[in-house]
Amino acid sequence: ILKDHGNEVLLLIKTKDVLEKLIQQDGFSFVNIQPKTRKNNPVAILLASFIRTWKVVSIVKKHQIDMLIGTDSSIAQAGYLTRKQAITTLEDDYEVIRKLADLTYPYTKTILVPEVCKVGKWNRKKIGYDGYMKLAYLHPNRFTPDVAVKNAYIQSDRYCLIRLAQLTAHHDAGIRGLNNQLVKNLIHVIENKGYQVFISVEGEIAPELSTYQLKINQNDIHHILAFASLLISDSQSMSVEAAMLGVPSLRFSDFSGRISVLEELEQRYRLTYGVKTNDPDRLIGLTSELLENRDIRSLFQQYRKQMLSDKIDVTAFMVWFIEHYPESVNIMKHNPDYQHQFN
């Protein structure tokens, strides 16, 4: 959209999961500022951050960049070092991503986050919007589930997804998720309810679970998710995506109760359930309970409809915010309801 409006856009990425492959399939040109996956220790994290910042500074100078927008600390730091406008877009609370936030928030000009998101002592830089980052690409104005895409992989209408995350981000340290035995127990419960099971993994799958692995073009994952009866996951991201699509989800994670976006989706809109990793029996029980409800899909679509009525078209809002920056900051600070024209 920004390009269609006559703006020049340079996309920067770092190697993560299947990100590079997805962008290539979408036909976007990009620069990878971290081609190799870093090790998951404090020294490696800091060194990789320094190298990314140095690379972004070089790119800003070479291409005469006017504005930087993104989630990575290198965006904020490079903006600070080159005296360019930098907008940080995130949706995790400060206490959850403290290390990333401490490398980012002091240097960025604006922190653009969902209204419910907490940014610690950096509230003066916060611009909150009534939406979620994942609504930017899963709002009905942006995404329409295609049953034909789903049918190319899965013919049944009665299936559940289990998503296994790698949990390698710096804020994932000490966080546990779904183990193989618990996944086997879940499969037993789900199949006994008459549903098929498909497992989506970020890394390698255990050999004994490989027959359940979902093998698809990753660009099609949201079409598969949209028609699922239930998502069970230790991925916070896919749980939010399921909520955007009105698909019930159970997230098994020690992050449960700690992330404001997911707490709002659970407590206010009833679109997801969080279960701590010390209570696997509750996860099994909720799985059985949800799959016994024959009206579960229509019920959660009603919950989704309520959520969407309260939220904005995040993409339309962000395009306006970027193109009118920094005036857009003053507008949002003095009249936050201005955003509700983007729906």
Segment roles from a protein language model:
Residues K3-A48:
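Conserved nucleotide-sugar phosphate-binding/catalytic loop shared by glycosyltransferases and other
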Residues G285, E292-N343:
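C-terminal amphipathic helix plus adjacent low-complexity
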Residues R52-V56, F198, E202-M238:
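Donor nucleotide-activated moiety binding/catalytic core segment of transferases
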Residues T108-G177:
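A nucleotide-sugar donor-handling region in carbohydrate enzymes
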Residues I87-T89, V96-I111, L225:
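A conserved, positively charged/aromatic
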Residues M67-A78, T88, I224-V261:
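A donor-sugar binding/catalytic signature common to diverse glycosyltransferases
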Residues K16, D26-K39, L81, L167, ...:
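Catalytic donor nucleotide-activated moiety binding site of glycosyltransferases and closely related
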Residues M244-Q301:
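Catalytic binding pocket for nucleotide-activated donors in carbohydrate/polymer assembly enzymes
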